[in-house]
Amino acid sequence: MRKFTILLMLLLASSAQAARIKDVAQVAGVRNNQLVGYGLVTGLPGTGESTPFTDQSFNAMLQSFGIQLPPGTKPKTKNVAAVIVTADLPAFSKQGQTIDITVSSIGSAKSLRGGTLMQTFLKGLDGQVYAVAQGNLVVSGFSATGADGSKIVGNNPTVGMISSGAIVEREVPNPFGRGDYITFNLFESDFTTAQRLADAVNQFLGPQMASAVDAASIKVRAPRDLSQRVAFLSAIENLEFNPADSAAKIIVNSRTGTIVVGQNVRLKPAAVTHGGMTVAIKENLNVSQPNALGGGQTVVVPNTEIEVTEKQGKMFKLEPGVTLDDLVRAVNEVGAAPSDLMAILQALKQAGAIEGQLIII
């Protein structure tokens, strides 16, 4: 009998567990920026491609080096692949620092293993170049093809990474040193948590130094001098306070049968019964052979057999205040399958018997 995996999120009461401000919020404007670029990977051992856009890019690269191919010449670029290069530019990155990059094939290349990324410009949302990437790829996947067409692929050979593969050429401006206030944005919006964070800052700095703007933002008065502002933030982000209890949630992975239950999830009184039905369809092909002198034709006649089996469901009652942990144990005892539990949870939610959010992924 298959048992469900239950992960009980021990979300302790706010009075018993404190958190640092830096663990629940971040300074507004201090964030990563996504970069993207188009480039070529060369040096592949015959696992590249020869698509129109790859050939065009290859010719453009040769022209940039002063090499002009004769008109009508089509290069065989089986050792070249067109790729998209992506990276995250961290906040406060300076010119000359390096960042990691991910390289992904966009054509029909079989593998990027053993390839070298040619110089690629990485641009931001504004179209400006912020970093330049180049280097040898590290590919964890592999692929092999036999003479008879058989093929084996492990992991993903068309995606690779280059550690410190891009050099930062342009810095991203941020509003860290502007104005008289700094805003903290909560990772999880909650009015109670926002107010408690503001209260903790006011208790540390003095009254009216911080205020909750909404469920996600807390505005804090800060010194204008940058050096003082850094020291100020260092002290503030390490303050401990008691966040609000997390919202009652049930996260169910229907593919693995994993269930994550929040501490505050409760069930109202209900009675549950669930039966299972199995439909088996069997196709048989019968041959109709006519008499040799009859002049008829041999035909294949399909014969379909359908069998329906239904097992009787067991009923169990949920008492007031029962937790979802108790429900899952009851479902396991009656031998339900993962799909059965999904149906039971959805039905309980529709009946209003679950006090919390049900999220199925």
UniProtKB/Swiss-Prot annotation:
The keyword Signal applies. It comes from the Bacteria. Its main location: periplasm. Coiled coil: none annotated. It is found in: Periplasm; Bacterial flagellum basal body. GO terms for biological process: bacterial-type flagellum-dependent cell motility. Residues 1-18 form the signal peptide. One of its GO terms (cellular component) is outer membrane-bounded periplasmic space. One of its GO terms (molecular function) is structural molecule activity. Belongs to the FlgI family. Assembles around the rod to form the L-ring and probably protects the motor/basal body from shearing forces during rotation. PANTHER family: FLAGELLAR P-RING PERIPLASMIC PROTEIN FLGI (PTHR30381), FLAGELLAR P-RING PROTEIN (PTHR30381:SF0). The basal body constitutes a major portion of the flagellar organelle and consists of four rings (L,P,S, and M) mounted on a central rod. This is Flagellar P-ring protein. The gene is flgI.
